[in-house]
């Protein structure tokens, strides 16, 4: 069974109202100003704040978004999490009871738009049949954190179950003569 966590871009209407976003995550913090939204206001700002390109061209590709995917197969489970903005030293994976907790944080640093600091916490429930003691974690060169664990498959041998026959009826009711 595959459970894909969709990015909010995929759950939006085709042409959303970007002036007044309905959810906090629909607000594009840290992005450039789009002069098409407020024409009278745009003349007061420096062109360095303007956003270039059409709105559809600004949609991030899959590789640029912080997606997470949970895959649950019959013999194993895997969590894939995009953490490319963090170094291995800034990541922490813990198992607390039946939950896997992933934390990442880095201090303020400069990027192409200015200064940014990032932090996130994610919790995943350990699937049934997975021993938390054998869960492993690895970080790929392109910044994908993979958490895996084998599922216990019960090796119950097949056997035939004999059928016995009772002389009494299963449902008590009026006696037929």
Curated annotation (Swiss-Prot):
Q: Where is the composition biased (Basic and acidic residues)?
A: 155-169
One GO biological-process annotation of the entry reads: protein refolding
Sites where the protein binds Zn(2+) 2 = 106, 108
Q: Which UniProt keywords apply?
A: Acetylation, Eye lens protein, Metal-binding, Zinc
Which Pfam family, an example, fits this chain?
Answer: HSP20
| Statement: the UniProt record of this protein carries the keyword Translocase | no
Any one cellular-component term (Gene Ontology)? nucleus
Question: Tell me, what is one Gene Ontology molecular-function annotation carried by this entry?
Answer: structural constituent of eye lens
- Locate the sHSP domain: which residues? 58-166
Supply the InterPro entries for this chain.
Answer: A-crystallin/Hsp20_dom, Alpha-crystallin/HSP_16, Alpha-crystallin/sHSP_animal, Alpha-crystallin_N, HSP20-like_chaperone
Which family is annotated? Belongs to the small heat shock protein (HSP20) family.
Q: What function does this protein fulfil?
A: May contribute to the transparency and refractive index of the lens.
* Family matches, as PANTHER family: ALPHA-CRYSTALLIN B CHAIN (PTHR45640:SF5), HEAT SHOCK PROTEIN HSP-12.2-RELATED (PTHR45640)
Q: Which proteins does it associate with, and in what oligomeric form?
A: Heteromer composed of three CRYAA and one CRYAB subunits. Aggregates with homologous proteins, including the small heat shock protein HSPB1, to form large heteromeric complexes. Inter-subunit bridging via zinc ions enhances stability, which is crucial as there is no protein turn over in the lens. Interacts with HSPBAP1 and TTN/titin.
**How is this protein named in the record?**
Alpha-crystallin B chain
| Species lineage | Eukaryota, Metazoa, Chordata, Craniata, Vertebrata
Q: Which gene encodes it?
A: CRYAB
């Amino acid at each position: 069974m595959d459970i894909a966590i969709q990015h909010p871009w995929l759950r939006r209407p085709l042409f959303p109202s970007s002036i007044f976003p309905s959810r906090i995550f629909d607000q594009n913090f840290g992005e450039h100003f789009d002069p098409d939204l407020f024409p009278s206001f745009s003349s007061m700002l420096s062109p360095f704040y303007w956003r270039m390109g059409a709105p559809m061209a600004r949609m991030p590709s899959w590789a640029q978004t912080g997606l997470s995917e949970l895959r649950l197969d019959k013999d194993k489970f895997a969590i894939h999490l995009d953490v490319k903005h963090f170094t291995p030293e800034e990541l922490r994976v813990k198992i607390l009871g039946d939950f896997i907790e992933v934390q990442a944080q880095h201090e303020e640093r400069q990027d192409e738009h200015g200064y940014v600091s990032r932090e996130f916490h994610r919790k995943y429930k350990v699937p049934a049949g997975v021993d938390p003691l054998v869960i492993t974690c690895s970080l790929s060169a392109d910044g994908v954190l993979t958490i895996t664990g084998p599922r216990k498959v019960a090796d119950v041998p097949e056997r035939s179950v004999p059928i016995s026959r009772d002389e009494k009826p299963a449902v008590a009711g009026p006696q037929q003569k």
